């Protein structure tokens, strides 16, 4: 996601200074508390947050203090919860669960998981059970901040980006280009099926009805994992809602049983 020129220049200038510090602190294997301090420096110097107005480490959720939280411009409502791990710890999916639970309890939509080297941005999914989607990730030590496009990696977690709704737009783009949405469009959009039917007639001069096309797409073309599960169901419902019709019902054909080889006499 392109960053505005002024913000891009700020990110590049700050990270040219901060990157060697991050690398040095990783070599020293600093503690989690010191990693929190380093992260606050990155967020204030490079990402546009006010260290004193926007960032707090004294926010209690059900009696437990989160590592860091973001309140934009000293507002009372938390906008982002930040889960910090010591710089020497490799980030793992299990690390995000506690932060997502914290966020869900407070109605907070965004969570950042970081060890100062790697940064991951998640969107909380308020469902039963609570879930999360990873929206963006980057490694500060793998980027070359002499190149302008490196700023684009950090921009989505900048204060300016959140205020402009950039992470939400990235999530929308992610959903729009997912295999679930593309599969749902192929199967449930009359316009798409009509276009395929029309082109088939033009190419091979044969009329094929749309239900037959949908059946072929589902059973022979589209991978099964793009058609099953909550993401697939949600995508199909969205296509159905936008097209104003009921979902197309297509029966899945069982996989053909393999025939054992005939033994030779």
PLM feature segments, named:
Residues 112-114:
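Acidic beta-strand-to-loop metal/phosphate-binding motif
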Residues 116-118:
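Short beta-alpha junction loops
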């Amino acid at each position: 996601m392109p960053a505005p020129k002024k913000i891009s220049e700020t990110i590049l200038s700050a990270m040219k200074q901060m990157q060697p510090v991050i690398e040095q602190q990783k070599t020293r294997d600093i503690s989690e508390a010191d990693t929190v301090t380093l992260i606050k420096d990155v967020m204030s110097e490079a990402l546009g947050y006010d260290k004193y107005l926007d960032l707090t480490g004294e926010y209690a959720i059900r009696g437990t203090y989160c590592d860091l939280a973001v309140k934009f411009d000293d507002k009372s409502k938390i906008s982002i919860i930040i889960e910090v791990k010591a710089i020497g710890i490799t980030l793992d999916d299990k690390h995000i669960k506690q932060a997502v639970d914290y966020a869900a309890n407070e109605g907070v939509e965004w969570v950042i998981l970081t060890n100062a080297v790697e940064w991951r941005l998640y969107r909380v999914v308020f469902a039963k059970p609570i879930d999360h989607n990873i929206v963006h990730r980057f490694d500060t030590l793998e980027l070359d901040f002499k190149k302008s496009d490196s700023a684009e990696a950090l921009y989505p977690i900048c204060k300016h980006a959140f205020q402009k709704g950039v992470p939400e737009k990235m999530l929308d783009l992610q959903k729009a280009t997912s295999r679930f949405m593309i599969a749902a469009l192929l199967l449930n959009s009359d316009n798409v099926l009509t276009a395929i039917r029309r082109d088939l007639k033009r190419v091979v001069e044969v009329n094929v009805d749309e239900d037959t096309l949908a059946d072929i797409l589902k059973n022979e073309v589209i991978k099964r994992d793009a058609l099953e599960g909550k993401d697939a169901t949600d995508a199909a419902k969205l296509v159905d809602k936008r097209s104003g019709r009921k979902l197309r019902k297509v029966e899945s054909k069982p996989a053909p049983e393999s025939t054992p080889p005939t033994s030779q006499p």
